[in-house]
Amino acid sequence: MPKVIVANINAEFEGIENETIMQILYRNGIEIDSACGGHGQCTSCKVLIISGSENLYPAEFEEKDTLEENGMDPETERLSCQAKLNGKGDVVIYLP
């Protein structure tokens, strides 16, 4: 099973394909802000991708647009409510 590894709290959690980073964190008791309720309309749930971005499905237009409008780089920052595991490997993130 692929894992989400949270570098700054030294934790790792198993996930499944198509599960968002936010879902994995919530399921494991890690609270993350979500002003828009997980609909990809804000950036309060953003995470930094340290490695393994190839193990996430690419950001869709709406997510990229939201990130870019707020001065963020969609290659290294993702909305945890939108970033889904593709099942191919682990992703290392940093929670701001």
From Swiss-Prot:
Query: What superkingdom heads the lineage?
Result: Bacteria
Positions binding [2Fe-2S] cluster in this chain are: C36, C42, C45, C81
**How is the co-factor bound, per the entry?**
Binds 1 [2Fe-2S] cluster.
State the InterPro entries in the record.
2Fe-2S_ferredoxin-like_sf, 2Fe-2S_ferredoxin-type, Adrenodoxin-like, Beta-grasp_dom_sf
Is Lipid biosynthesis one of the keywords UniProt gives this record? no
Query: Of which family is this protein a member?
Result: Belongs to the adrenodoxin/putidaredoxin family.
Q: What is this protein called?
A: 2Fe-2S ferredoxin-5
Gene name per UniProt: fdx5
